[in-house]
Amino acid sequence: PKGNLVHETGKMLEKNGYAVKVFDLIRLKNSDRFNPFHYMKSELDIDRISEAITEGTKKSEHMGEDFWVQAELMLQRALIGYLYFDSKDPETGAQLYMPNLGHVADLLRGVYREDPDVPSPVEQMFEELEELQPGNYAYKQWRLFQNFKGETRNSVVAILSSRYSIFDHDDVRNLISDDTMEIDTWNTKKTAVFIAIPETNNAFNFLSSILFAVGFEVLTHKADDILQGRVPGYSRKNLRHIQFILDEFAQIGRIPNFTQVLSSIRSREMSIKIILQAVNQLEALYKSDWKTIFNNCATHVFLGTNDKDTMEYYSTRSGKQTIRTRSTSKTHSYRNGSSGENKQIQGRPLLTPDEVARIGVDEGLVFISKQNVFKDKKASVYDHPKQAEIASSPGDNNWYDYQRLGTDIDGLLLYTNDLTPQFKSLFAA
């Protein structure tokens, strides 16, 4: 999350043949760029991207009635769909320009009519799109949205405009203007991806959850295509295992359909390592789904916590142990005496919550499915065979300095001659 890990390990990784990608949400500069439109291969992806954005940018679990959510999604699908279809040659399918999410914000500015009797620029653009590509999915969604009138329509536009206002920042636009993440190569090419996420401000963290949502979708389909022989020149042996090491998982934001992803990616040569400080972080983010997520993790490594709920969870998870007790008693009197012996079998937690809390700073508890818990010493990075190649400070020869080229805002308008006049006017506004 702090962005230091890439500096400490980047040079070692490149030396060993890895391509290094950096997605910096702290400074929003000197970063690789991520554009979801780059990974939209069919109109079905319009719905997937729309839902990922809605999930990633919502501010709370209480989004109001389902009617408003669905109405907003309808407009969002129409606008994203417009960009998807308009950016392709209707005859050849060739890419005329590469849209981005900032363009959706531009389209939203052109939805309102200045004159009630004159169609808005966006209305005209949809009609032109329908003439060029009759029956397209975007126009169908737009016509459904057109059924809303008056305040209902205005409210839906206002809600979606608020959601997309984040893309008015130039730095955010630059970050999503193009794509250098090359997600579709991660499971066939040695790649290390670092995502720097702010720990004190989550304004832009939704971009990381969208990145993961798109990444899981793209990589799952790519793995399936390879495993089913649909990628010439590739077979199972070419499929590299991908590890998602999600440190400070609670900072990423809610990843759409994460419970389903966690249970399905194992067969696609992917695994996820979730790193948390406390159980309640996961519960706050995923509500009742947190138990499903925990149960889908075959191995738990406990390194320490101050959280009571977490201590109790792993105390219960450790199971019970049997304790045998024996007590004897003797009585004496003037004439005779007696003695007795009592044996009992009792159960107690193998580790009580306070015992879980008091494991040594150099120790950890390991829980593996269908196995007894065991306590072991923590591994040290200084014992790793490549520890000499890891940097410790900026003055270290192994410190990795990188440069990722930015994109000027003018570079967003590729192939501007292929845009409709109305679309050009929105960009010029």
Question: Which positions does each model-derived feature cover?
Answer:
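P-loop NTPase motor domains
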Residues: 1-270, 285, 354-375, 390-429
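Short loop or secondary-structure boundary microenvironments that flank
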Residues: 197, 201, 248, 276, ...
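Conserved ATP-driven motor cores of ASCE-family P-loop NTPases powering translocation/secretion/packaging/pilus
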Residues: 262-264, 271-365
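Short secondary-structure boundary/capping segments
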Residues: 11-15, 37-39, 288-292, 316-321, ...
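Short, charged/polar low-complexity linear motifs in solvent-exposed/disordered segments
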Residues: 212-213, 220-222, 300, 320, ...
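Intrinsically disordered, low-complexity N-terminal regions enriched in serine/proline/glycine
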Residues: 83, 96, 313, 331-333, ...
